[in-house]
């Protein structure tokens, strides 16, 4: 007589296996720990307190007793982790065929991963692969995450949310937004010159009223923004701007546009940064017309000017705040900047300064400060941000960059089961994540804005 319910539990999928083959590679690998500080066990919102160092406390004693002086400056921000998830499935037949087909002779059932008892090949082979893919996603989103990210076609936002990046806010987005808002002072940002003169894309659309005009519509980056006709062409365009400006400028982060009303009945559209591109069109319903003027084509940054990385890193060190001198600082920069620096050194027939050990690896230095080259930045600037601002550098301390997650202690972070009907071993991973930097005084940037 067969059982109504049946369950198998082999191979034993233990928390130890999860920790050894998944959590440690994904959240504890040196590629993470060497860049940032990871804070775990944040399940929702946590307050990050910043206590300013007191000074000027000691005064001349001119009378009996004491007179208190000075105080602490306490500021804080909240960090709220956002839920993330990935799912992976694998059929045993394909797994064996690709990796260890010869082990079938030992008695394994090729369609049932559950029978892999000795050795625990599945956990030892597949979990690290999943962990590596998950970590690649984590690092990409850690830097380039943007809740307003949109899918891109030929460098132009499509109006469709890009869930490869929209889960939470990454460091690049923090830096760009806070430079624009002057939260990070302009003195802590260094402009980077390239061999190509860069330009923003620009266009002006001017409405001419028609006797039967009922509404206007301007499409920007595949999204239509409409406005009912008001008392005049000028009033209509002003109303359009008041209605849509905030929504339009909140889109797509560094790949977005700025809209203004430079003159009567006109709307000017400009890419947010040099090299950014956009699509647009305008029409009047029921009569009237639009005329386009002031057209400027976008020109992206080209190769770096000769010796530009050397000049940039030197300028970044000149911009270091007094507070930064108290910490171990590290440069992070794109591969394009690294190659430019190498060319400079070759031309001068000099070599890099002494290498230092960082997280068990020898890394080059610039004036004694370690350099971490991030070729992944080059890749994702091209893919996720249309290649605008391709040369970037960051100088900070790892203690200042914070990645918050609930992952390493969440007992429900990873699930696994074998679906007998589909003959698939499935894994589901979920964690919460968010990034923040603690102190604007501990950051110097280069190449992030115009």
Where are the predicted features?
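Sequence/fold signature of self-assembling virion shell proteins
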Residues: 2-51, 114, 159-191, 269, ...
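Assembly/oligomerization interface modules of large self-assembling protein complexes
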Residues: 23-104, 154-174
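Internal, well-ordered alpha/beta segment that forms a basic, Gly-enriched binding/recognition surface
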Residues: 85-89, 100-101, 118-138
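Solvent-exposed, polar/charged alpha-helical surfaces in well-ordered, non-transmembrane soluble domains
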Residues: 124, 128, 132, 238-242, ...
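Sec-exported extracytoplasmic/periplasmic mature domains
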Residues: 131, 135-139, 143, 245, ...
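Short, glycine/acidic-rich hinge or "gate" loops at secondary-structure transitions
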Residues: 139-164, 262
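Disulfide-bonded cysteine-rich modules in secreted/extracellular proteins
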Residues: 190-210
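Extended, beta-strand-rich, solvent-exposed assembly scaffolds of outer structural proteins
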Residues: 206-284, 303
């Amino acid at each position: 007589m067969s059982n109504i319910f049946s369950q198998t539990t082999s191979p034993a999928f233990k928390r130890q296996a999860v920790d050894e083959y998944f959590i440690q590679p994904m959240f504890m690998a040196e590629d993470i720990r060497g860049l940032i500080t990871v804070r775990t066990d944040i399940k929702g919102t946590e307050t990050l307190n910043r206590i300013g160092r007191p000074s000027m406390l000691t005064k001349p004693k001119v009378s009996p007793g004491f007179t208190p002086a000075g105080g602490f400056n306490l500021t804080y921000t909240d960090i709220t982790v956002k839920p993330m998830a990935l799912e992976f499935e694998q059929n045993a037949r394909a797994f064996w065929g690709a990796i260890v087909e010869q082990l079938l002779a030992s008695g394994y059932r090729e369609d049932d991963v559950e029978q892999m008892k000795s050795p625990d090949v599945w956990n030892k082979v597949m979990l690290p692969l999943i962990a590596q893919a998950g970590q690649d996603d984590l690092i990409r989103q850690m830097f380039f995450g943007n809740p307003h990210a949109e899918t891109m076609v030929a460098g132009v936002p499509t109006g469709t949310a890009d869930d490869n990046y929209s889960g939470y806010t990454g460091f690049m987005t923090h830096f760009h937004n806070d430079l624009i808002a002057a939260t990070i002072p302009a003195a802590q940002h260094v402009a980077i010159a390239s061999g190509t003169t860069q330009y923003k894309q620009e266009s002006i659309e001017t409405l001419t009223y028609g006797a039967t005009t009922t509404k206007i519509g301007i499409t920007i980056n595949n999204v239509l923004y409409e406005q009912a006709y008001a008392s005049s062409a000028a009033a209509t365009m002003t109303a359009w701007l008041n209605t849509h400006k905030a929504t339009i400028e909140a889109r797509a982060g560094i790949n977005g546009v700025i809209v203004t009303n430079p003159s009567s009945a006109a709307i000017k559209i400009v890419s947010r940064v040099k090299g950014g591109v956009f699509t647009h069109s305008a029409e009047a319903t029921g009569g009237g017309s639009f005329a386009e003027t002031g057209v400027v084509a976008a020109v992206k940054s080209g190769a770096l000017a000769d010796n530009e990385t050397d000049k940039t890193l030197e300028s970044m060190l000149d911009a270091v705040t007094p507070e930064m001198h108290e910490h171990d600082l590290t440069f992070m920069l794109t591969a394009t900047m690294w190659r430019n620096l190498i060319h400079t050194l070759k031309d001068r027939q000099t070599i890099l300064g002494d290498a230092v050990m960082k997280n068990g690896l020898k890394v080059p230095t610039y004036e004694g400060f370690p350099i971490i080259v991030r070729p992944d930045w080059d890749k994702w600037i091209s893919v996720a941000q249309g290649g605008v601002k391709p040369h970037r550098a960051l100088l900070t301390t790892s203690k200042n960059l914070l990645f918050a997650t609930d992952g390493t202690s969440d007992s429900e972070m990873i699930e696994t089961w074998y679906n007998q009907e589909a003959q698939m071993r499935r894994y589901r991973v979920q964690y919460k994540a968010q990034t923040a930097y603690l102190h604007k005084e501990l950051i110097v940037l280069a190449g992030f804005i115009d």
